[in-house]
Amino acid sequence: TKYLKYEFELRRNLTIIRGDSATGKTTLVDMIRTHMNDGESGPVTLNCDKSCYVVEGNLWKGQLDNIQDSIVFIDEGNEFVRIKDFARAIQQTDNYYVIVTREGLSALPYSVEEVYGIRTSGKYGSLKQSYHSFYRIYPDSTTENIKPEKILTEDSNSGYQFFDAVCAEHQMQCDTANGKSNVFSYLKAHRDEKIMVIADGAAFGPEMDRVLQLVHTRENLVLYLPESFEWLILSSGILKDTEVAQILQTPSDYIDGKDYFSWERYFTALLTEKTAGTYLNYTKKTLNKAYLSDSTKNAILGQMMKGKQE
């Protein structure tokens, strides 16, 4: 008999499993399917806080309609994970999703931190028991030691306005890609410039493969991917709020995936709520000038430097 064991913890609504064939990705989904069909009397033991289901094929919509507060596994080869219709449908649910895929899924807002490969370790004696665990594929920043001449942000909201003001003080340029899916083409078009890319790690997962390839082949790019600009402000300590400090330590304990499909949305709501009616009153579209006062600005930039060194 061969024993296989998979052990992992899900932190967010969307977890992506990548990797070549024969790394055990499909075996994991097969085991969940077997348990779904045979239950406790079957060969698979499942130890989990939530029910687990496999959704597949053309009837995915109907299957999803019947699943609540569960973990949904989707194996590679299910083309529906690419379509906007699927992205819309899952954002109306309170489930967690584990999707096996080889390519980036541009319709889905998944975090760079929740893209995993499966590592196999340990064969125990004659039992041939192998233990599988997840490992993170992407870093949340790259530490190439370059002095950028330009900062590129993914959109033109408050984050861009903040970095644009900082750049102006340092005779640097700040540009926006007008959407995360344009970051790659912007970098290709500006191949000779030293650029620091700042994007929301909480939803940059689909772009990471191709952008990281550019970073690795060129000496003049550096990536900085905080959860979001709002997370950066909250982490900088300027609010001096103990509840915020607790939330930042283990966000997954506080964020209800049903209300906030992406952590970036949660941190925006938290910052907006915590600063309402104060001099730091935050809105996503237009940066409050209070964030450009020296002490506030330096606290935010200081948090960035901390993140780069960790």
Where are the regions a protein language model picked out?
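N-terminal pre-Walker A segment at the start of P-loop NTPase domains
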Residues: 1-6, 126-130
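Hydrophobic anchor at the beta1->P-loop junction of P-loop NTPases
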Residues: 17
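Conserved glycine(s) of the Walker
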Residues: 23-25
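Post-Walker A alpha-helix
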Residues: 28-30
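Post-Walker A helix-loop "phosphate-sensing" segment adjacent to the P-loop in P-loop NTPases
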Residues: 34-45
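Conserved P-loop NTPase "ATPase switch" module shared by AAA+ and STAND
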Residues: 57-84
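Structural recognition of the conserved hydrophobic beta-strand(s) that form the central parallel beta-sheet
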Residues: 73-75, 94-104
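Acidic, divalent-metal-binding catalytic cores of TOPRIM
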Residues: 78-79, 113, 118-310
